[in-house]
Amino acid sequence: ALGVAQILSQRGELIHGSIKFIFQPAEEGPPEGEEGGASLMIKEGALENPRPQAIFGLHTSPSLEAGQIGVRPGATMAASDGFTITIRGKKAHGAQPHLGVDAVVVAAECVMALQTIRSRRTDSTQPLVISVGMIHGGNRFNIIADEVKLEGTIRTLDEEVRRRVPELMRQTLDGVTSVYGASYDFDYKRRTAIVFNDPALVDETLRVMKQVLGNDNVIPLPPFMVSEDYSYYQQV
């Protein structure tokens, strides 16, 4: 981007309007409880004076050769949401599990049951990822754990699927925990939105990219389930 800025600064007579370059940290969002990334830059006026009529984002990628560029119209990068589930059971001695409610067993079944949301509860043609990345529970090898915490991420490329997932998760957790006599707390946080590339802008820039790079070096991309808070700029 710096190279492009340098070239454009030398050809100012060809520019009819204003071009603004944004160099943003924390493109996958700031740490929990902090401000940062695209939302903070917007809040601090990065898109004001002048206000852009269109915005384009660039990412480097090891999957493309030098001199190539990848592009995709429509839904391109997934929305990213996060969740924390706390399973609550009842402690007992490991030799007498029938006297307790094993939060580890309940949590393990919840992890597996949540995967059926993708395979059995949502349209199989709509991409969805439910990943549990952290499991913490128990404090002694011979004691039935009374609490297990699960944390994970949800990725979606369709806003309706995204809207439905929290309720489907609650239904799943209700069913599993009730079978074992356990309970749970569920915290769901919506984070970055879907990156949706305007098809008209993509078509307009494709012609230029092919002129400069050649048809063979403009690569159509599949959708990605990774996320990028560039989507905040698109909502302004």
Write out the residue ranges for each language-model feature.
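Histidine/acidic-residue-rich, glycine-tolerant segments that coordinate divalent metal ions
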Residues: 2, 8-134, 139-143, 228
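Metal-dependent amide/peptide-bond hydrolase catalytic core
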Residues: 108-236
